[in-house]
Amino acid sequence: MIDFEETEFQLRTEKVQKNMFENNVDAILLCTEPEVRYFTGFRSLFWQSPTRPWFVVIPKNGKPIAIIPDIGRDLMARTWIDDIRTWPSPRREDEGISLLVEVLEGAKNIGILMGEEASLRMPLEDFEKLKSKIDGTFSDCSKIIKKVRLIKSEKEILILKNICSVANRSFDRANRLFFSGQPLNEAFREFKITLLEEGAEEVPYLVGGAGRDGYVDVISPPSSKPLENGDILMLDTGSTLKGYFCDFDRNWAIGTASDIAKRAYSKLHKVTELALDEIRPGMTCEEVFKLINNDLGGGSSNIGRMGHGIGIQLTEYPSLMLNDETVLKENMVITIEPSMSYGEGLMMVHEENICIRDGKPELLTKRAAEELPIIR
């Protein structure tokens, strides 16, 4: 089941432990799916159930320790983890707390994710109980974890390239999939099937919109309203391969394209091209945001950011936005996602996935057509 060789997980763990040493952190407690998977290789859709908590502790030295419900023992044993401690769950009176107390014994400064984009995937009541039973105190380890997860290995980048290729091939079939009169929810369904046919393992994220000359919303479930001549259809997919996401979209006109839609598309294509030409290691996320936003004319969208990190999550730290001073470094994988508002409440979004390299970034997605494609 394991998606990488043991050396991949060993390197990730050692990098974090080096950061722990530098910050006087004795142990790190992880309880969220992306972090547990990142450091162990434990990949399962069973996380969809909120009933059972799952824990991994990274000590100062050695391999991580898994403290998990017994139902996950066999799968965890197929990863590189040796120390697996389990309990019969659900068990409301003790959902792994006594085991955590044992593992964390002697740790004075315990890291846990507290920063932006973090969450606590255990009952708050249990967390308070855990704090009362240990001698150590908890501190924010978000920067320690993010510092490692920001930089992708070449093996991770290859998987990201492959899932982008799956979506590329699926988008290339648009002329055979979509047509005037087709209900929007049917278009979504056909595209999801196509993604699976082309090699995606899962399609956990597929959003989009459609409307005359543009769309007004990109996060609602698709309606049964038929596509009409003059509509702009946009689909944005976060499909996965070995648990890694692509995240990009494509736009098409149905039948005919209005001048206003063509102009919006052309503007977004050109500003994306500018970003692809200008982005370099050493730039901050804020600088990239300003580069894109200024070329769009400023204030053209209220979405708040023009891209983000991507990897084992659909959206990862950092964000291409104001006040994000994260410095771009080689092997970071991010999206470039300019958007603009126009007409009577209409909007359009373009998105590509890139890897930061020495010099110009590497485009992981097949570049969108220079002119708005028309499906006839």
Predicted regions and their residues:
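Active-site neighborhoods and metal-handling regions in enzymes and metal-associated proteins
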Residues: 1-376
